[in-house]
Amino acid sequence: MNRDDLCRLLDTPFSQEQWDAISAPLGPFVIKAGAGTGKTTVMTARVVWLVATERVQAEQILGLTFTTKATAQLQARVRSALRRLSDEVHGVPLDEVGEPTISTYHAFAGRLIAEHGLRLGVEPGSTVLTEAASIQLAYQVVTRTQRDLSVLGYTPDKVVSVLRSLDGELAEHGVTPEMLRAFDTRFQQDVETAGNAARRRVQLFDKVIDNSKSRVELSHLVEEYRAARRVRDVMDFSDQMLIGMQLATEFPEVGEQLRQQFQVVLLDEYQDTSVAQRLLLTGLFAGGHPVTAVGDPLQAIYEWRGASVANIDDFNMHFPNPDGSRSRALTLKENRRSGANILDGANSLSTSLRELHDVEPLVTPANPKPAGGIRVGLLPTFAEE
């Protein structure tokens, strides 16, 4: 299937940069796709091209994204595209063409646990706690612990909040409570070594030390909270990713099985993945496996919940070619959504970020939208805005 065939099949005029991403050889590569450049369209077309050219069968493709809504949208677009392929090219029913597996990152980790959790002593039928049940269990741990929490100076409700936050942050960064305690102990020693002169220059030192000591105390509580979940055979979302990461990194046979099952892996919104998610994925699919990550470093907005934009910046090192060399990086920069004036403003505002993340500025296509304009206003009320 050539470019013209695919354009006609999907009724989309693919640009050269889009076609380069769609028809790239099997192997690991990252697509840095700016806003409005057709990221989802390219991912859908990549699936169709791989199946149409018989590189892989549809059911050998794994696609991961973040939300159930995004999963449903990608599934619908891929299913519609494959239906066109089955009708117009293969002339066979869609159920004979097959469908890729598309899910959220957390659902994939949950599947991993269901199939392999016993390797870590985790029952396949473990229940995932609701938000309310998670808070309730944390409150039980806080009110029943033998540790002296008065040193924190928090109310029980506040302790529950910071406990759950720290538990999730540790899981998303792949850091154990023991590792956190070791870091904070060294940090406190370093600050003390800095001496009183430095303390006078930086008045925040005392507050920083207090926060560090609080983290050490809370890290013990995190262990009690996790133990309480294990005893009850329940887990939360942070457990899913942490246990999935452990299965991927500690049991090579799990990765071998999944690489045989999924010949191609597509990773959506990769700029918003966490360290734990990246370690799970590299544990399963690194070493030259055909992994395509798509994302935009300039749209990384979830660092507050553990996301690491370094994952997309360093993709070609985390997912090298089979010979160990760095994998390819492709770019989608042709914005088909906005006019030239809007793109000029966006590029101007993002200059420092683009330089930091090695991202090219957005450009208009051959047949651009109307130039448009930018208005800036500071209005006194939400209603007026």
Regions found by a protein language model. Name each.
Residues D4-L6, L10, W19, V48-A52, ...:
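Conserved RecA-like helicase ATPase core segment
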Residues T65, S86-A197, V216-H220, M235:
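Conserved ATP-dependent motor core of P-loop NTPases, especially the RecA-like helicase ATPase domain
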Residues V42-L50, L62-F66, A70, L74-A81, ...:
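Structural preference for long, well-ordered alpha-helical segments in enzyme cores
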Residues A70, L74, T104, A133-S134, ...:
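Helical mechanochemical/support elements of P-loop NTPase systems and associated helical scaffolds
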Residues R119-G125, R226-A228, A329-L332:
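Short hinge/gating elements
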